[in-house]
Amino acid sequence: MSFSPLIRQLIDALRILPGVGQKTAQRMALQLLERDRSGGLRLAQALTRAMEGVGYCRQCRTLTEDELCPQCADPRRDDSLLCVVQSPVDVFAVEQTGFRGRYFVLKGHLSPLDGLGPEAIGIPELLGRVADGAFSEVILATNPTVEGEATAHYIAQMLIPKGLTISRIAHGVPLGGELDLVDGGTLAHALAGRKPISL
């Protein structure tokens, strides 16, 4: 089916979203145009406002509408702990655990093949953030992928000489998981990171 230029432009715009392919974008576009024009206009207005009004926190680099995000503006948080994550969505995930420390958001992970070196993801800014000596522990909460592990290892190499405690989030068997359903790599990490039981 051949679409008009405006419909084609809408479909192409929707395809930039993660997980949205050609067919899904077509269905979304046609749904908005045929059945929910007011919803489409609300979506367009909300998207415009967000793109114009949401920026980055000047301390942790997560998404926020203010100069400081709510976590950085909160004086009750533990200033001795810094959790390093790969993206703003990771801040929201860690917040669900009840973590009360501070954050630093990288812009992804090291990937030399994609041209993403330490400067591109913000490692110099991270080193600047810990330079004042306020933090006693840095928790590396990058993703458990090859790139995430490489990023955590690189950061640890940069921070260990500063005398900080450097920790890595644990990886392993999910709570309630069954061993026969866990992949070999995850199970190997779980075995390597085992802890003694104290009674």
Curated annotation (Swiss-Prot):
Molecular function terms in GO for this entry? DNA binding; zinc ion binding
Entries under SMART domains matching the protein: TOPRIM (SM00493)
Q: Which UniProt keywords apply?
A: DNA damage, DNA recombination, DNA repair, Metal-binding, Zinc, Zinc-finger
Q: Which GO terms describe its biological process?
A: DNA recombination; DNA repair
KW DNA repair (keyword) present: yes
Q: One Pfam family, please name it.
A: Toprim_4
Zinc finger region(s), C4-type: 57-72
Residues annotated as domain Toprim: 80-174
Q: Which SUPFAM superfamilies match?
A: Recombination protein RecR
Q: Which protein family is named in the record?
A: Belongs to the RecR family.
What HAMAP family does UniProt report for this protein, alphabetically?
RecR
The record's function comment reads:
May play a role in DNA repair. It seems to be involved in an RecBC-independent recombinational process of DNA repair. It may act with RecF and RecO.
Full protein name: Recombination protein RecR
Source species of the chain: Stutzerimonas stutzeri (strain A1501) (Pseudomonas stutzeri)
